[in-house]
């Protein structure tokens, strides 16, 4: 063999990926072949895997969290498809709700248009058009990420079919009697003028006014309590006018103390919990006091107080009520209760027959029910209330506190609890809470900690408020009799409404006569037509009903729901309640939740901080496959960090993977030969090739186990290590000589070519769900018959590939090789030799290692010109590296004293 006849690698697969330009070409190819349609045909009739898409909101460009979510879904869908399942993916969008209303209102303000002068149906039409526009934008952005789905047949919560089914689902709750009208405190946004769900709330630090306020004892069974002030502490002074009761804990110890010279409270007696006395003394700067009496909380029974504003028109009794929620964590051990402004307060007062009244209107202003304060906005009321308390000599102390406080995640405005008439689904009346908790026990969670998180929420959540006081949403399909106040429950009316919505949408609820919906059986003048809309979480909670159950290509329940960890209180939660309430079980078999995307330091991304990275910017700089590597390599169970230094590391890993493929393709000259694994006589292969096939078999088992547990970051890590350690640093390094310098007909080279073909097919399939574009690029080079790598199935390997004894042997041989390489590198560092081929090895091994090293050519596996192996009497491996003597072969560069046998022609 002459130097000119060296088998140099040759491939059209370039070293430079150029993903930014290559990926759009592949997208066009997928569009041309209609990849999604081909996927459905290829696995038609097989077991289904249904990942039901949680609908993103149709508003604004996608962000890193959305990209993470969609890529993770796509990886899983593709894994199951290549595992032989019919893995259907139908993308969807959440379309109703406040954010879109706000956008349209902003446009109105810009154009000096008055929303109140615009017909509701026209406003809703503009909302619909806005959502439709962003759905199309999102489609393009998701496709660019490499996400494959039924884009032409997506679902949307604003579709007529969806709105009709939402009506039918509400009808089921109505029929069983668990949907009711109630007057309860709900989280309310005075900016958005509507109730909010827990999932629409975020907690931020907020500075609140604090007060220690006196409620004079009016009647008591404890003599020492006469002429005493009960002290409460609150961070919401504006709720004092709405106070109806005080709460204590019967198990706590309380103290009556007499103050010294303390201004308005000079020589007055006050009562606080013993455990909190020290903090009260400190906060209120009390200089002197004496203890009068200690007693148990249970002795408060039948005690009545007066309102601090008794002289200002608040001349009603304030009873003291026993409550377990009173603790000694903060305050005075006595809690002021305003039933219109807190769930605990409301429930306690309800228990004792004290009704909540409307004290604050939708704008956040006091109503006429509160003398003195009517018309004042509650967020401006604190100074006024504090001043009035001072005037009445009922203010012991006031201050400020920075604490975590609920805000609207949309407007960022602080929220309040406000009692309003709303529509609720009961958690208790038909056992919804129990059904939901049972369903969670039957659901798989990835990671498992998600189960306890959502369980804790279900265990403590109040009844589900499903009404909103807005216009862009599905109208509540409810009529209430004007005289009897009874809710109309009639399946025929409900189905009539649903049928109308199915044909023309729900706008007609706002424009058409009630008689059209009631039919001939009832008179419209007898009924109030409810004008509230359904909260958006009920909308999306019904997707299982109008997507999974209605489409022939899907099935109910879904195999998996996959969203961010915030959806334990959002979509996972609402879907669970809706499905358990109507079908008795969860609409999913498993839940996978992922963390949030944060910057490289672990901080929340914020435009004001300047640490936001947009998917679009990453695609322009790196391409989608680098972003997909970031998703696959990250532990989604935690928050996921990203910045350009992290992406650069992934780009470097990608280059290593790409070079691995390039080496395989180059040595095969892009002439891939599919190997029949079952008929392959593995015993005829050299030991090194047999070992590599064992590694392929072993890696495939690990791959399947990681895949089944959705442990992608360890799966990716193992694939990357196989490329860099097993292949590039080991097998490729050793076999480069045979592949380049052996004749094409040599058994050793032909055996290696067989293994390279198997490794190439294995790797391109293992990586396909992750590197969707790059593997497609490779597949077009090696397979002219099939249309796409994504239509392929994972390989199945014969058990003959598995050889544990050989594996154990090569573990030891690789250890010897590593020690030899250290010795060679030392000689190279001292300039005694150049390349390893200028070295000869003398290897001394103990008896057991010497035995397994028989018939092993260490010059081959250590890439030296020669190697001698001796048995020694010591357990230590002793390596001596000397400079090889002889002539250098111009082809293989090995140095021998005799002519190179391979290249002597």
UniProtKB/Swiss-Prot annotation:
EC code(s) of this entry: 6.1.1.5
Principal subcellular localisation of the protein: cytoplasm
PROSITE patterns for the chain: AA_TRNA_LIGASE_I (PS00178)
InterPro entries, A to Z: aa-tRNA-synth_I_CS, aa-tRNA-synth_Ia, Anticodon_Ile_BEm, Ile-tRNA-ligase, Ile-tRNA-ligase_type1, Ile-tRNA_ligase, M/V/L/I-tRNA-synth_anticd-bd, Rossmann-like_a/b/a_fold
Motif ('KMSKS' region): 604-608
Keyword Hydrolase: no
Biological process terms in GO annotation: isoleucyl-tRNA aminoacylation
GO molecular function: aminoacyl-tRNA deacylase activity; ATP binding; isoleucine-tRNA ligase activity; tRNA binding
UniProt keywords, alphabetically: Aminoacyl-tRNA synthetase, ATP-binding, Cytoplasm, Ligase, Nucleotide-binding, Protein biosynthesis
Ranges spanned by the short sequence motif 'HIGH' region, renumbered to the chain: 56-66
Residues binding ATP, per UniProt: 607
Family: Belongs to the class-I aminoacyl-tRNA synthetase family. IleS type 1 subfamily.
Its biological purpose: Catalyzes the attachment of isoleucine to tRNA(Ile). As IleRS can inadvertently accommodate and process structurally similar amino acids such as valine, to avoid such errors it has two additional distinct tRNA(Ile)-dependent editing activities. One activity is designated as 'pretransfer' editing and involves the hydrolysis of activated Val-AMP. The other activity is designated 'posttransfer' editing and involves deacylation of mischarged Val-tRNA(Ile).
Domain notes: IleRS has two distinct active sites: one for aminoacylation and one for editing. The misactivated valine is translocated from the active site to the editing site, which sterically excludes the correctly activated isoleucine. The single editing site contains two valyl binding pockets, one specific for each substrate (Val-AMP or Val-tRNA(Ile)).
Name recorded for this polypeptide: Isoleucine--tRNA ligase
Species of provenance: Pelagibacter ubique (strain HTCC1062)
Gene this protein is translated from: ileS
């Amino acid at each position: 063999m002459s130097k000119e006849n060296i088998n140099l690698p040759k491939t059209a697969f370039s070293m430079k990926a150029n993903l930014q330009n290559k990926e759009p070409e592949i997208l066009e190819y997928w569009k041309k072949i209609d990849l999604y349609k081909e996927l459905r045909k290829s696995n038609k009739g097989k077991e289904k895997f249904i990942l039901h898409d949680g609908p993103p909101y149709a508003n604004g460009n996608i962000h890193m969290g959305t990209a993470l979510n969609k890529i993770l879904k796509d990886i899983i869908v593709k894994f199951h498809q290549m595992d032989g399942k019919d893995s259907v993916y139908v993308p969807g969008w959440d379309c109703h709700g406040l954010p879109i209303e706000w956008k349209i209102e902003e446009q109105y303000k810009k154009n000096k248009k008055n929303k109140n002068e615009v017909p509701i149906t026209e406003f809703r039409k503009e909302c619909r058009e806005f959502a439709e526009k962003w759905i199309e934008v999102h489609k393009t952005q998701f496709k660019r990420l490499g996400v494959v789905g039924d884009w032409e047949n997506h679902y949307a919560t604003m579709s007529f079919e969806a709105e009709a089914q939402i009506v039918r689902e509400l009808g089921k709750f109505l029929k069983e009697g668990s949907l009711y009208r109630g007057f309860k405190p709900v989280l309310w946004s005075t900016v958005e003028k509507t109730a909010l769900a827990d999932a629409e709330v975020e907690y931020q630090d907020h500075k609140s006014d604090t007060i220690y306020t006196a409620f004079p004892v009016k009647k008591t069974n404890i003599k020492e309590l006469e002429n005493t002030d009960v002290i409460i502490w609150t961070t919401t002074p504006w709720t004092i006018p709405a106070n109806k009761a005080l709460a204590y804990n019967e198990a706590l110890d309380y103290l009556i103390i007499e103050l010294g010279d303390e201004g308005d409270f000079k020589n007055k007696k006050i009562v606080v919990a013993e455990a909190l006395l020290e903090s009260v003394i400190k906060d209120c700067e009390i200089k002197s006091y004496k203890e009068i009496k200690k007693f148990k909380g249970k002795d408060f029974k039948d005690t009545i107080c007066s309102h601090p504003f008794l002289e200002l028109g608040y001349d009603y009794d304030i009873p003291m009520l026993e409550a377990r929620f009173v603790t000694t964590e903060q305050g005075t051990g006595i809690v002021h209760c305003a039933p219109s402004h807190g769930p605990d307060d409301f429930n306690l007062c309800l228990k004792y027959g004290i009704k909540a009244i409307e004290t604050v209107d939708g704008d956040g202003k006091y109503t006429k029910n509160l003398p003195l304060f009517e018309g004042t906005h509650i967020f401006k009321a604190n100074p006024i209330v504090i001043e009035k308390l001072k005037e009445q000599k009922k203010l012991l102390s006031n201050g400020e506190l920075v604490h975590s406080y609920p805000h609207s995640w949309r407007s960022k405005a602080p929220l309040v609890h406000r009692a309003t008439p709303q529509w609720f689904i009961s958690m208790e009346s038909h056992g919804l809470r129990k059904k939901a908790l049972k369903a969670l026990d039957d659901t798989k969670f990835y990671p498992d900690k998600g189960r306890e998180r959502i369980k804790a929420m279900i265990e403590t959540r109040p009844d589900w408020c499903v009404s909103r006081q807005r216009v862009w949403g599905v109208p509540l399909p409810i009529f209430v009799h004007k005289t009897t106040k009874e809710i109309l429950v009639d399946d025929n009316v409900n189905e009539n409404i649903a049928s109308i919505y199915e044909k023309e949408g729900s706008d007609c609820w706002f424009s058409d006569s009630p008689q059209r919906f009631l039919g001939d059986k009832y008179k419209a003048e007898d009924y109030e037509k409810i004008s509230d809309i359904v909260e958006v979480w009920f909308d999306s909670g019904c997707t299982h009903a109008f997507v999974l159950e209605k489409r022939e290509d899907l099935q109910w329940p879904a195999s998996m729901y996959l969203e961010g960890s915030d959806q334990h209180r959002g979509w996972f939660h609402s879907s669970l309640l809706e499905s358990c309430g109507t079908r008795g079980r969860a609409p999913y078999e498993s839940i996978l939740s992922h963390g949030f995307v944060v910057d490289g330091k672990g901080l929340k991304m914020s435009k004001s901080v300047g640490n936001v990275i947009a998917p679009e910017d990453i695609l322009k700089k790196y391409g989608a496959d680098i972003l997909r590597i970031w998703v696959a390599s990250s532990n989604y169970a935690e928050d996921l960090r990203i910045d350009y230094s992290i992406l650069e590391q992934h780009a470097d890993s990608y280059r290593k993977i790409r070079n691995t493929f390039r080496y395989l393709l180059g040595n095969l000259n892009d002439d891939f030969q599919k190997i029949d694994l079952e008929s392959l006589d593995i015993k005829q292969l050299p030991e090194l090739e047999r070992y590599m096939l064992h590694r392929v078999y072993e890696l495939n088992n690990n791959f399947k186990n990681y895949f089944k547990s959705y442990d992608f970051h360890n799966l990716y890590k193992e694939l990357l290590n196989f490329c860099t350690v097993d292949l590039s640093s080991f097998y490729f390094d050793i076999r480069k000589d045979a592949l380049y310098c052996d004749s094409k007909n040599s058994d050793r080279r032909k055996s290696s070519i067989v293994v390279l073909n198997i490794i190439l097919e294995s790797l391109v399939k293992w990586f396909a769900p992750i590197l969707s574009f790059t593997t497609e690029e490779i597949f077009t080079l090696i397979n002219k018959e099939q249309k796409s790598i994504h239509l392929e199935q994972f390989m199945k390997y014969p058990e003959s590939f598995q050889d544990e004894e050989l594996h154990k042997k090569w573990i030891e041989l690789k250890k010897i090789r590593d020690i030899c390489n250290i010795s060679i590198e030392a000689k190279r560092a001292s300039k005694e030799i150049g390349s390893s081929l200028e070295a000869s090895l003398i290897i001394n091994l103990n008896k057991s290692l010497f035995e397994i090293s028989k018939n092993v050519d260490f010059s081959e596996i250590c890439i030296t010109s020669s190697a001698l192996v001796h048995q020694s009497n010591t357990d230590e491996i002793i390596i001596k590296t000397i400079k090889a003597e002889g002539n250098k072969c111009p082809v293989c560069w090995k140095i021998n004293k005799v002519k190179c046998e391979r290249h002597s022609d």
